[in-house]
Every structure is written in C-alpha cells, then in structure tokens.
Amino acid sequence: PFYLVCGYGVTGRLLVHQLAKRDIRAVVVDIRQDRIDALELDNLPLPVPALCADASLPDMLDHAGLQHPKCIGVLALTNEDRVNLAIAIASQLLLPERQVISRTNSDLTTANLASFGTDMIVDPFRAYADYLALAARSPHKHLVYDWLINPRHRHLASAYKHAEGRWIICG
C-alpha cells in the first residue's frame, strides 16, 4: 500500500520522511523539478517514485497511481489552495472511498473541501494560532499537549510563565 503525496515542499518532505521511516510507501507528485531532484538525493530507506507534473490535473493523478488498488490515500500538501482543492475533488469523484487529507490556507477553501467530503482538512496557520493561544491561556495544558505530540519532551518546570503586562504577537 502507498499514499499519493501531492507537493514535496517542507510539509510534504517531512511527511514522506516519516512515512518512509515507518516502512510506509509513498508516491510523490510535484510541479517543480528541483523538488523531485531533492527527493532523489534525500537517501530515504524506501524507494519513493516521483512524478514532476501538475497535480491539479486528474490525468496526472491517475498516472501517479490514484486509481491503483494499492493507493490507500491522497495527501494534498501543495502551497496553493486551488491545486489542493482540485486534487481533493478529483480524488473524491474518481474514488470516493479513498482517504483524502488536504492542506488549506483559507476558510473559503476549507468550506469547499468539506463540501466534497474531504476526510481531514488542515489549516497550518490556524493550527499554530490555536497552539500559541493554548500556551498563553493554559500553560500547563499546553505542556501536556506538547508531551503528547513532541518527541523532545520538556520538563514540567518548563511550563510557560505568564509575563506581566500586554503582549504583542506579530506575524
């Protein structure tokens, strides 16, 4: 079985590396040849087939293995909402039982992805904002959360302490 990973930027690369470390196969589609070249130089423990193509085109997804019986899921991780939406729609229309996970940067795209039955929708900016808000509002809950998801655990004494006065968060 394998996952079809569309987009080999920072997120796609980290995900493919983690999948390979766990002996889970992946096929990568990215529109940029330099990213495909980087994948070939990454020295992964498993071979990872890659295709330099526009993942928003259903024919390219099909060529990469979307309808292959061993494809167990599609991960739309490009930097463009338009492309991720096209990947999710094509995946859901061609094989509705196939798991689809998509990255998004806007509420409008989130709503569109949800309307097509996307299994999981991740907005990295909203997720990070929620993470920061938890740290500010509930430092000990944040610490427990960090223990659960972070491989480099912090000590209990390292919970964030509230600084007096007003905060300015930029970004």
Language-model features, listed with the residues they occupy:
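Cytosolic regulatory regions of ion transport systems
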Residues: 1-171
